[in-house]
């Protein structure tokens, strides 16, 4: 069977796990799932292999802090596959680092909290994309997706979070400009507030919802829609409306009003570019001590 070949980073938990699971289990793809936690990846692979799906998870233990290890992974992939259809950059260490410091200004946080949002998140996405780009350029096709957040548009948790997410949004935009002549797309996905192994936002989206959003872009979006979204940010909830999918409970977790509010915000000049824009008030943001309750699982993981 000619399965589509995909790579999903950060696939041991959270959005990455949900995306890898849906691609393999619901879409029948062969997914090279990367993370540091090999045991969690093996559990994911077993879940797919024991289902009635034709898809496959290939567990790939990988520390994306190690550039040479990433190069070795890409080279190994290329010896096994003659093409890559999809790269999803989902690995992110920031929330685990941020959780113990909710409510603090940036100067009271360790520098390592800032680094966590940029190293495994922004930088790791750039490195992985740069190493897979030649393969996509050569085959004149492929899709790169960065998993980001509305925190790239509006102040949420802290300075590092915003800088990292804004960087991911811009990463897709600038990569798309250079990849466009070669038939390769780069798009940023914004999930809504989520319920994962780390986070527990009320009525939040599950990682399966993001998985279905990614699958829609891979298997359902036509060339016109991909060109419209190329280099842009799209919300998972917007894709759910376009391609008629729901979360695992049969619901649309992020409502139409919230989705529209976020889209309006994304369509307006960012505060740094508008002299008329008011600065955000951190006391009314998610940078508050009580917000740590939304990260109950953070204590179970290391950055």
Predicted regions mapped to residue ranges:
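Catalytic loop of short-chain dehydrogenase/reductase
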Residues: 93-94, 105-113, 117, 143-173, ...
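Rossmann-fold cofactor-recognition segment
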Residues: 48-67
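A short, exposed helix-loop element centered on a Lys and neighboring polar residues
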Residues: 129-130, 173
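Conserved NAD(P)H cofactor-binding loop of Rossmann-fold oxidoreductase domains
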Residues: 90-102
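C-terminal helical subdomain
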Residues: 188-189, 200-302
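Conserved glycine-rich cofactor-binding loop
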Residues: 12-14
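Conserved glycine-rich Rossmann-like NAD(P)H-binding loop of the short-chain dehydrogenase/reductase
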Residues: 26-43
């Amino acid at each position: 069977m000619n399965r589509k070949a995909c790579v999903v980073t950060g696939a041991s938990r959270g959005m990455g796990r949900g995306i890898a699971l849906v691609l393999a289990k619901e879409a029948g793809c062969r997914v090279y799932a990367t993370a540091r936690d090999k045991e969690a990846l093996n559990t994911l692979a077993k879940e797919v292999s024991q289902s009635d799906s034709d898809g496959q998870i290939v567990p790939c233990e990988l520390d994306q802090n190690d550039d040479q290890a990433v190069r070795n992974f890409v080279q190994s992939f290329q010896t096994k596959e003659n093409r890559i259809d999809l790269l999803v950059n989902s690995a992110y260490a920031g929330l685990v680092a941020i959780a113990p410091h909710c409510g603090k200004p940036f100067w009271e946080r360790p520098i390592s909290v800032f680094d966590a949002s940029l190293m495994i998140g922004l930088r790791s996405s750039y490195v992985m994309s740069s190493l897979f780009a030649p393969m996509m350029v050569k085959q004149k096709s492929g899709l790169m997706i960065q998993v980001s957040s509305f925190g790239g548009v509006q102040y949420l948790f802290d300075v590092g979070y915003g800088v990292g997410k804004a960087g991911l949004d811009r990463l897709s935009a600038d990569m798309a400009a250079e990849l466009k002549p070669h038939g390769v797309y780069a798009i940023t996905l914004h999930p809504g507030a989520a319920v994962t192994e780390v986070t527990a936002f009320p009525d939040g989206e599950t990682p399966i919802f993001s998985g279905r959003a990614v699958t829609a872009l891979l298997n359902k979006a036509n060339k016109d829609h991909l060109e419209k979204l190329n280099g842009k940010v799209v919300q998972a909830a917007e894709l759910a409306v376009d391609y008629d999918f729901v979360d695992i409970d049969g619901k649309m977790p992020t409502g139409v009003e919230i989705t529209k509010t976020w889209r309006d915000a994304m369509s307006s000049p960012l505060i740094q570019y508008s002299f008329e824009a008011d600065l955000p008030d951190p006391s009314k943001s998610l940078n508050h001590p009580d917000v740590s309750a939304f990260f109950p699982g953070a204590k179970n993981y290391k950055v």
